[in-house]
Amino acid sequence: MLHSIALRFEDDVTYFITSSEHETVADAAYQHGIRIPLDCRNGVCGTCKGFCEHGEYDGGDYIEDALSADEAREGFVLPCQMQARTDCVVRILASSSACQVKKSTMTGQMTEIDRGSSSTLQFTLAIDPSSKVDFLPGQYAQLRIPGTTESRAYSYSSMPGSSHVTFLVRDVPNGKMSGYLRNQATITETFTFDGPYGAFYLREPVRPILMLAGGTGLAPFLSMLQYMAGLQRNDLPSVRLVYGVNRDDDLVGLDKLDELATQLSGFSYITTVVDKDSAQLRRGYVTQQITNDDMNGGDVDIYVCGPPPMVEAVRSWLAAEKLNPVNFYFEKFAPTVGN
């Protein structure tokens, strides 16, 4: 049986390989042209030491000097000995360039673009049917602005493995990409992008999940939720999304969230708007909408994506309330403007 192995490098690059159950991760990587740092291949030197963030595996044979028992319990692995038993995510303690990873660049043809809200643009790119865009739900791509050498980072709002990818883009007045999308982009136009990138992705759902989204920070959560719905599992934990924006007309993707609520058992969401004149049921910041049930006595995984002030506000709120979730994952984003 072949397993998918996502190798995450120190420079934020992720590369996917396949590995059989009787093949070490290092050998599989070498078959894909990736040179994980090695000195021995026998579990003796510890040079290839990495960390398994997700998945089940056989750690193989090694000496204590290469990998201590405490390190092994924490999830550290030696790729030269590790054999995957399921799909895995392995953090490699080296840069992608040091491992001779070739950048994964793809092209997509625009098939749809519309204004999701007064402040958001959303668009879809069709990928060559013979290709597949691999990424972990929640990760992002670097999209090239057509006619320039500049690129911008946007989270995938679609699920992995599809022949189409979608993105949400905040419409920034002086933004180069949003300006291009608003004024120049045409259907059938070709865009170039590479990736995937990022440490913000969905881990194995084993306990209740609380998602906190600010503005277009909703995008990675749409990817995560579609992925979970696609699993068609009845044993998934509950998922609660609190989606915050500044104004009513900043809200986007509600139809998709309603659809996901019918597809994913245990998923629910609420919206909250900062504007005191909002017509929405809830007003204020996302932290004002978090309940004791959401926190589940601390037995919860929290994912946060939004502008830096929002992410820091959530951190501060948790500290002030003396709340300690089992895991806290976050991604901050800010617009790039000007020339």
UniProtKB/Swiss-Prot annotation:
[2Fe-2S] cluster binds at C40, C45, C48, C80. Its EC number is 1.18.1.3. Pathway: Xenobiotic degradation; benzoate degradation via CoA ligation. GO terms for biological process: benzoate catabolic process via CoA ligation. The keyword Nucleotide-binding does not apply. GO terms for molecular function: 2 iron, 2 sulfur cluster binding; ferredoxin-NAD+ reductase activity; metal ion binding. It comes from the Bacteria. Residues 98-336 are annotated as: Ferredoxin-reductase. Residues 3-96 form the 2Fe-2S ferredoxin-type domain. It is an enzyme of class 1 (oxidoreductase). Keywords: 2Fe-2S, Aromatic hydrocarbons catabolism, FAD, Flavoprotein, Iron, Iron-sulfur, Metal-binding, NAD, Oxidoreductase, Plasmid. NCBIfam families: BenC. PANTHER family: NADH OXIDOREDUCTASE HCR, PROTEIN RFBI. Monomer. It is part of 2-halobenzoate dioxygenase two component enzyme system. The other component is a dioxygenase component consisting of 3 large (CbdA) subunits and 3 small (CbdB) subunits. This is 2-halobenzoate 1,2-dioxygenase electron transfer component. It comes from Burkholderia cepacia.
